[in-house]
Amino acid sequence: MKRKPFNVGPVTLRSMPFWCVGNPLADPFGSKVLESIPSVQTAEIICESANEGLIEATSFHDDDLVPWNPENLEDDLEKNSDTMQTLCEIKEMLNSAGVSVNTATCSLHGNPIFRNGGVTNPDPKIREIARKKVERTIRIGNFLGAKYFTYWVARDGFEVPVAVDWENVYKWLADGLNSVYDYIKRKKFTNYIGGTIEPKPNEPRGHMFIPTSGHAVGFILGKLKNPNFWGVYPELLQHESMALMNAVHTLGYLISMNKLSFLHFGSQIKAQFDNDFPPLIGPEGLKETVQMFWLLEKLGWKGVVEFDCHMLRCEANPKEPIQSRKIFIKNCVTALSICLELSSRIKKVNNVEKITESEIDLSAIMKMCAVDEKKIASCSVNS
């Protein structure tokens, strides 16, 4: 089955990843709120949401789908292994529901073996294990038909600057990402249309080696041997807001460089830890979020919007772990539809008619909120 694209405004597909749906909502201060569910059950929830017309795609970390054993790095190649049986079941479910796979991501953050980094680990033996895990993820992505292989910075970062091997760390990172391209070409995997990088300023490490979208583009163009293969997927509002940057600026820059692959979507309080709030949820960010979609429409960009967030920990119901997850998906989709509707209202703002930038901004706000500008003008004059 092939599902009809969403194709509303700049959004071609709505993707809800396994890690968002399966999240049991543990945090550094407390244990999980919801019971963990197996990946097949997560796939079932995703497929049900697709059948309800809420989403068209999904994504995964390798560890979201199947366990990883560093003593058996090629279990996915064993036809009768538990790993392959689980992957076959998930593939059949996704195909039956017409859910495409946007991206395959290798988890290089969960296992303590990667506590000092994955592809940038100073220990060459750990870097080799990371490379093998990446190759396994690429194979799983090929099996499920993923369009992108993505690298997010995970634990490739530092806390102590003087402890970093600065002469080699970016070479190791380039070697790791170049090997992704080489492996895909060597295996003749045709499902992948590119690789992508997700930057993040900090967390889980104190500083990350690729902290912003600008760093990511510079690294791609300056260090990778096949820069046309690679793009960037920013997590907005979250990651850029952590560094007090503006999401509209980020998207404008990436589009100008032809490096915006797709978009990770959620909400964030600026300068805090990675909140990963659902879109539009929380005390701030409405204007910035809506203007993101205004910009995408204005510049003619079209692509996948992928949710990367989790439900608020306080609203998870331990007695209804499945229903809580379904409500979360619906809320994310509703928020996206709100953004698209509000952004469509401000695309008619005519900058030429306004004298100042403040007037342009106020006019855009009134249009976004469907406020009668003439009524506001009359109320502003004390007669």
Where are these predicted regions, by residue range?
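Active-site-proximal loop/turn and secondary-structure-junction residues that shape catalytic pockets
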Residues: 20-22, 62-66, 105-110, 153-157, ...
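Histidine-acidic metal/acid-base catalytic patches
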Residues: 1-54, 73, 139, 147, ...
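Glycine-rich, aromatic-flanked loop segments that form ligand/cofactor-binding clefts
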Residues: 3, 9-18, 44-68, 78, ...
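Surface-exposed, active-site-proximal loop segments in enzymatic domains
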Residues: 24-31, 65-82, 110-128, 155-168, ...
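Active-site-proximal loop/short-helix segments
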Residues: 106-117, 146-168, 190-207, 211
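An active-site-proximal structural segment forming one wall of the substrate-binding cleft
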Residues: 90-93, 122-149, 169-188
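Extended, charge-rich low-complexity interaction segments
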Residues: 100, 132-136, 299-302
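Catalytic-core regions built around general acid/base machinery
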Residues: 76-98, 173-176, 180-183, 291-295
